[in-house]
């Protein structure tokens, strides 16, 4: 039964369109990842990266975007209301201290820079998923929440994510 459901989803032309869009947009997504990575975001100082994330979420069609008291970014993509909500989250901060040169450089097929993998890659994935869903006009049964959390690294002690859980998201 589950296999048949997965096959039906995979065979849906909208899902194929979303996957094709994601593949086609890899070069753009990499540039987006670099741009996000080059915004300094040491733990407790994620504001500038959060502002850029909000700007991009709006550009990709989301209108219900808020920041909670901790500074977490929460963006809702409404579903039809017939299914459970799903949260997709990535933390915005990096382990690198204030003053670190965040320039990303390319060496062959590799991109090297503070926070390019941890966690500009997670933010890139959130945005790439959103763009792909929008391009394919996929309506989900439940709401999708795109979340940029704060204070994950080091002394941040995942406080942003803890606040999300405590507050019911």
Outline where the language-model segments fall:
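Acidic/histidine-rich catalytic neighborhood of metal-dependent amide-processing enzymes
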Residues: 110, 115-169
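Acidic/His- and Gly-rich active-site-bordering loop/insert found
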Residues: 4-110
């Amino acid at each position: 039964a589950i296999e048949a459901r997965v096959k039906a989803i995979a065979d849906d032309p909208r899902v194929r369109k979303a996957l094709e869009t994601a593949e086609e947009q890899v070069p753009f997504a990499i540039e987006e990842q670099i741009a996000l990575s080059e915004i300094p975001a040491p733990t407790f100082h994620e504001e500038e990266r959060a502002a850029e994330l909000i700007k991009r979420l709006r550009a990709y069609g989301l209108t219900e975007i808020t920041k909670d008291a901790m500074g977490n970014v929460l963006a809702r993509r409404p579903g039809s209301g017939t299914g459970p909500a799903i949260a997709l989250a990535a933390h915005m901060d990096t382990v690198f201290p204030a003053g670190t040169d965040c320039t990303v450089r390319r060496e062959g097929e590799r991109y090297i820079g503070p926070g390019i993998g941890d966690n500009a890659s997670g933010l890139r994935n959130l945005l790439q998923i959103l763009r792909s869903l929008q391009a394919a006009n996929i309506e989900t049964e439940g709401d999708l929440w795109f979340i940029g959390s704060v204070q994950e690294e080091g002394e941040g002690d995942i406080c942003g994510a803890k606040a999300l859980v405590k507050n019911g998201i």
